[in-house]
Amino acid sequence: MPRFISFEGIDGAGKTTLAKKVYEVLKKKGYNVILTQEPFTREITELIKKAGWNDPVLLTLLFSADRAFHIKWIMEQKPEIVLMDRYFHSTIAYQSVLGLDEKWIEEVNSKFPKPDIVFLLDIKVNEAIKRIRKDDQFNFEEKIATLEAVRKKYLELARKYNFIVLDAMSKIEELTEKTVQIICSLVKCS
C-alpha cells in the first residue's frame, strides 16, 4: 500500500504549488511518487461546473464516485508515495458548511484509504482572496463567507484528525523543506 499524503486548505492557500514542489524534491530523491488532484475525472468536473449544482448531497456523491475512480487509478500505478492535492477532507469541509451531516460524509468516504499525513495550509481568507484575484477564478464577494466557514471547518478537522497545520504565508522554500522533512520521517528518505 502506498503512503498517502494529502494537501488541504481553502482556495488560494497554495496547496497545488506546495504539492508540486514536494513532488519535484521526492522525485529527485528517487522515489516512485505520483501527484494527483481532486476532482480527478474531467467528466465529473465538467458535469458539476455545467450544472452549477450546489446540492451538498449530490456533490458529495459525485465527488465520492470520482474518488473511487481516482483510487483505482492510483493503485494501478503502484507508487510508493501518493501526493494528493485535495482528498476526502475537502468534501467534508466544503459540503458540511453547506449543511450536510459530517458523519454521513465520513461514512460515504469510509472505504477509501486514510491519508498517512494531512498537511493543512492555513491562510486568512483576505490573503487567500488576494492570491485568487491574481488568477481571477471566481466572484469574490459571494465566496468570502463560504471560505471563512470552510477555513473554520478545516481547523476543526485538523484538531479532530491531527493534521499538520502549516502557515500558508510562509515562504514556499520553507514550506517545501518542512513538508519534505515530515514525509521523510514517515518513509525513511535517504
Swiss-Prot record:
Taxonomic superkingdom: Archaea
EC supergroup of this enzyme: transferase
GO molecular function, one term: dTMP kinase activity
GO biological process: dTDP biosynthetic process; dTTP biosynthetic process; dUDP biosynthetic process
Pfam families for the chain: Thymidylate_kin
A GO-annotated cellular component: cytoplasm
Coiled-coil residue spans: none
Gene3D superfamilies the UniProt entry points to: P-loop containing nucleotide triphosphate hydrolases
Family: Belongs to the thymidylate kinase family.
PANTHER family: THYMIDYLATE KINASE (PTHR10344), UMP-CMP KINASE 2, MITOCHONDRIAL (PTHR10344:SF4)
Name under which the protein is recorded: Probable thymidylate kinase
Organism lineage: Archaea, Thermoproteota, Thermoprotei, Sulfolobales, Sulfolobaceae
The encoding gene: tmk1
